[in-house]
Amino acid sequence: FAAAEHAHKLQPTSESAAGCAQMCIKKEDYAGAIEYYKQALSMVDNDEDKADYLYRMANVYVSLHNYQQGVAHAQQALDLNPEDGRCYLLMGICYASAKVYDDPILQRSVFWVACDMFRKAKTVDSSCATDANKLIATYSQYFPSKEDVFFHRDLNEGQPFRVGGWIGKTTTCRSKAE
């Protein structure tokens, strides 16, 4: 690692910065990885490479359990490359991992938004369909029951629901298949 870092300092390129970031990730030095990805990002001109580095940074933030930054960086990558389904998959995983409600029934609304993202991933990028379908099957099991939806004053099956907290997305209220 020291040799790669030294070579990067002598002749920095986006590739050498990304390589150093990968080595930092292997050592679980996520702060270092983010810094190297920022360097890599500053050295590229084309949107495809920028989107790739932003996606990689998003993954590092997920490793740090900083889901809000994970979503923010995945969204920046999508702004540059709207057909990258991996970004939607990652955003869905971030939403599913987020804690935005104390109410255990409302907390399950994060899974609706997550599944929306997984569906979007396979719509824009067919190479993500298998992973998206697996994630939908996994996370839709955590939707609230029909009974929980019926008895909760804030929920109506099939109606729009705005998920609060930092997510701030409107989705459709759904119950799990029984």
Regions from the language model: what does each represent?
Residues 9-10, 43-46, 80, 124:
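Structural marker of alpha-solenoid helical repeat scaffolds
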Residues 45-48, 62-65, 92, 97-106, ...:
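Short coil/turn linking the two alpha-helices of tandem helical-hairpin repeats
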Residues 120-178:
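Terminal, low-structured helical/coil segments at or just beyond the last alpha-helical repeat
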